[in-house]
């Protein structure tokens, strides 16, 4: 069984990922032949974006199961628990990682032969990947109704095809609007320190012919004040039960600025990103990454020796700042706690 998109390719025995650290000027691929290599690729941000991480982890789980099946002197379930733990430890904030791993774990039927288990797991991983594409396109269909023809949108980080299995969430909304015949202009925050906006989002948008204007993160407020922005759309790595949203660091600042200037602030994400076990944003674990990401830019040191660094990869935007959350099941509006509960049958 094979599967291929821009972000990833499953060969049946390995997972090939486009190396997002090298884009846009170099297109390299990293082939992962074991679950440990998949875990390293997630941790090192070869692949990033909550939905993409989830699907990648699912294929990593398959590779782990294939490896476990060859270990004659070890209990299959014990090995798979370790596979789960290794993959789950890679990126603590993105809930899609745990959602996908839990789904894969539930797929293991010990009443079946190992070969059947492996086949079931491979089918489930491909199903997760294929579902993500359909979900993203549905998010786009719902979300594009919020964008008027000729409007200008600001986005932060990268929530496009590269952050998902394909099509994208926030960029999927923009893409769907363009496909419906609307003319959309997009302002892209560069998104320090990893520059996902400059390197990935700008590249994706230009590839599909969208008018794209790159700005530094500290320009967003001034651009809003000048009346250049009609809406803001971002993705999400985890959404709490009350509607608080964890997303790439800098999202909170953009939300505050949007609120100050009366600009609608939209979040686009699949329902798998909603963690109903988390009451509010204060309970969401925030990953901290290497100091080198702040002190260096593309390997060039820009900060003095000995300077202290704080590098949280995500921040939390309170639900009061969010105009709507766009999901595959429709557009959620306040009160989020009640409407999210209804979405999950509460």
Swiss-Prot record:
Signal peptide: none annotated. The keyword Iron-sulfur does not apply. The record marks 157 as: Transition state stabilizer. Its EC number is 5.3.1.23. InterPro entries: IF-2B-related, IF-M1Pi, IF_2B-like_C, Initiation_fac_2B_a/b/d, M1Pi_N, NagB/RpiA_transferase-like. The keyword Isomerase applies. SUPFAM superfamilies: NagB/RpiA/CoA transferase-like. Pathway: Amino-acid biosynthesis; L-methionine biosynthesis via salvage pathway; L-methionine from S-methyl-5-thio-alpha-D-ribose 1-phosphate: step 1/6. The active site is at 237 (proton donor). GO terms for biological process: L-methionine salvage from methylthioadenosine. It catalyses: 5-(methylsulfanyl)-alpha-D-ribose 1-phosphate = 5-(methylsulfanyl)-D-ribulose 1-phosphate. It holds the Pfam family IF-2B. Substrate binds at residues 48-50, 91, 196, 247-248. Keywords: Amino-acid biosynthesis, Isomerase, Methionine biosynthesis. One of its GO terms (molecular function) is S-methyl-5-thioribose-1-phosphate isomerase activity. It is an enzyme of class 5 (isomerase). It comes from the Bacteria. Gene3D superfamilies: translation initiation factor eif-2b, domain 1, Translation initiation factor eif-2b, domain 2. Catalyzes the interconversion of methylthioribose-1-phosphate (MTR-1-P) into methylthioribulose-1-phosphate (MTRu-1-P). Belongs to the eIF-2B alpha/beta/delta subunits family. MtnA subfamily. This is Methylthioribose-1-phosphate isomerase 1.
């Amino acid at each position: 069984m094979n599967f291929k998109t821009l972000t990833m390719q499953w060969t049946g025995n390995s997972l090939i990922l486009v190396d997002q650290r090298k884009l846009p000027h170099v297109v390299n691929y990293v082939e992962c032949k074991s679950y440990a290599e998949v875990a390293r690729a997630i941790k090192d941000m070869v692949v990033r974006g909550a939905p993409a991480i989830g699907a990648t982890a699912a294929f990593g789980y398959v590779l782990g199961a294939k490896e476990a099946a060859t270990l004659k002197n070890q209990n299959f379930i014990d090995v798979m628990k370790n596979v789960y733990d290794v993959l789950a430890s890679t990126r603590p904030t993105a809930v899609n990682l745990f959602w996908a791993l839990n789904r894969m774990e539930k797929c293991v039927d010990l009443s079946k032969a190992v070969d059947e288990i492996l086949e079931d797991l491979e089918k489930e991983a491909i199903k997760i990947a294929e579902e993500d594409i359909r979900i993203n396109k549905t998010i786009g269909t719902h979300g594009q109704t919020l964008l008027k023809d000729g409007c200008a949108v600001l986005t932060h980080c990268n929530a496009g095809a590269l952050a998902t299995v394909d099509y994208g969430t926030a960029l999927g909304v923009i893409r769907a609007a363009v496909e419906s015949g609307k003319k959309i202009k997009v302002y892209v925050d560069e998104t320090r320190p990893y520059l996902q906006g400059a390197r990935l989002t700008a590249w994706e948008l230009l590839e599909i012919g969208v008018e794209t204007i790159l700005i530094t993160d500290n320009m967003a407020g001034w651009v809003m004040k000048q009346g250049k922005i009609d809406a803001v759309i971002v993705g999400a790595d985890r959404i709490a039960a009350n509607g608080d949203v964890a997303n790439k660091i800098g999202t909170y600042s953009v939300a505050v600025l949007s609120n100050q200037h009366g600009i609608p602030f939209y979040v686009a994400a699949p329902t798998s990103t909603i963690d109903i076990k988390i009451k509010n944003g204060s309970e969401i674990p925030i990953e901290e990454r290497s100091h080198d990401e702040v002190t260096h830019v593309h390997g060039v040191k820009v900060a003095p020796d000995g300077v202290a660094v704080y590098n949280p990869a995500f921040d939390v935007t309170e639900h009061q700042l969010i105009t709507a959350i766009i999901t595959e099941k429709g557009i959620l509006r306040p009160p989020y706690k009640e409407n999210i509960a209804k979405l999950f049958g509460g």
